[in-house]
């Protein structure tokens, strides 16, 4: 096997919550890392940036011409209003990416990050189909509903046959990690919510369902996700396999929520059985409050919409089902890494404080 110093990787979505972690770990291991993203903000130092529109097939071919990466990590997606649109757009992104990779260009492995909507269904038909019992296993049959994850997988499998590379699929749960201006960032969303509630003298109210409050759940640390993606891309045991990826522990929000409230010095309240209290509703007037907090503390970002993804946390915490995964397949294949979910949450809070994104307490 070649040494890491002459190995080249391409990360699509490099400035995202998982892309940043993948890039950082590869760079630490001596890889040459190229990253494709819409913006350069959040690009880890040492990454060779590529700016191209994933929906423009010609632009993708021009941007990747001659690159010849050994491994490609696909972590980007584009959120649309309906699943039909998600399928069209996100199917096109991976198709354009794979078409832009030269058939004889040295690509050995392509790793695709998806998630638990593989088992739950898409956002516009969320948890309405007949689902398997928890914990979710990788060999569960697909749901009988349209899902852009299925479309992306099928495109990946077909390209692998034609172009001769191996593949892996990584189904993460809610990701705890570091990124700004990210579509799905629960740690930063809940942290911003807690800071606003503290300033307003209001309680840190659980916005979701009693089922989510009381049920067993797991999450995925972004660095752990990166470790599994890299492992599957460099170990034969990861070839042509789909893997769940979660921290390895489980918890109930009724246990973790009070700890988060205490960490931020704010009183908390559990869910109301008769009605959700969604963050999108609670935080509809958050923009000027956060702007004042940012000005007072000299924070780097005053636009709350670049920090908090209210809709995503509402979606995750509003589930009326229990949701966690089985990690046996990954462990049996040799990936034994794990994380503590509470430590993951609070270590990321400290990272945001250190970066002057959150107030330093």
List where the protein language model places each region.
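NAD(P)H-binding glycine-rich loop region in Rossmannoid oxidoreductase-like domains
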Residues: 41-43, 51-96
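Conserved Rossmann-fold NAD(P)-dependent oxidoreductase catalytic core, especially the SDR/UDP-sugar
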Residues: 85, 92-148, 168
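Active-site Tyr-X1-5-Lys
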Residues: 140-173, 178
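Glycine/proline-rich active-site loop of Rossmann-fold NAD(P)-dependent oxidoreductases
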Residues: 163, 177-193, 231-243, 267
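Mid/C-terminal beta-alpha module of Rossmann-like enzyme folds, strongest
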Residues: 226-314, 318, 326-328, 332, ...
């Amino acid at each position: 096997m070649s040494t890491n110093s002459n190995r080249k990787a391409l990360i699509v979505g490099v400035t995202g919550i998982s892309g940043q972690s993948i890039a950082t770990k590869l760079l630490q291991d001596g890889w040459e890392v190229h990253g494709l993203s819409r913006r350069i903000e959040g690009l880890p130092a040492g990454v060779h940036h590529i700016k191209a529109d994933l929906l423009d097939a010609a632009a993708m071919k021009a941007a990747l011409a001659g690159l010849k990466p050994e491994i490609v990590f696909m972590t980007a997606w584009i959120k649309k209003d309906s699943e039909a649109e998600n399928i069209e757009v996100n199917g096109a992104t991976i198709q354009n990416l794979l078409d832009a990779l030269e058939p004889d260009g040295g690509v050995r492995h392509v790793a695709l990050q998806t998630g638990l909507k593989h088992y739950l269904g898409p956002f516009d038909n969320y948890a309405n189909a007949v689902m398997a019992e928890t914990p979710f296993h990788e060999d569960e049959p697909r749901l009988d509903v349209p899902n852009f994850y299925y479309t992306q997988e099928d495109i990946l499998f077909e390209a692998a046959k034609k172009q001769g590379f191996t593949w892996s699929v990584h189904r993460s749960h809610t990701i705890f990690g570091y990124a700004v201006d990210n579509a799905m960032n629960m740690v930063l969303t809940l942290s911003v919510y807690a800071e606003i509630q503290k300033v307003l003298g209001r309680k840190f109210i659980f916005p979701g369902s009693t089922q989510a409050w009381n049920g067993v759940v797991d999450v995925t640390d972004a660095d752990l996700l990166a470790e599994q993606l890299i492992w599957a891309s460099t170990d034969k045991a990861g070839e042509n396999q789909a893997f769940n990826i979660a921290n390895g522990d489980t918890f109930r929000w009724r246990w973790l929520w009070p700890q988060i409230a205490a960490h931020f010095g704010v009183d908390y309240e559990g869910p109301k059985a008769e009605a959700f209290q969604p963050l999108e509703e609670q935080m509809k007037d958050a923009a000027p409050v956060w702007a004042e907090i940012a000005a007072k503390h000299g924070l780097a970002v005053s636009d709350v919409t670049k920090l908090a993804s209210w809709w995503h946390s509402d979606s995750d915490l509003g589930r009326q089902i229990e949701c966690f995964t089985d990690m046996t397949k990954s462990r049996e294949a040799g990936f034994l890494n794990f994380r503590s979910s509470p430590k993951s949450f609070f270590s990321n809070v400290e990272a945001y404080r250190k970066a002057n994104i959150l107030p330093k307490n």
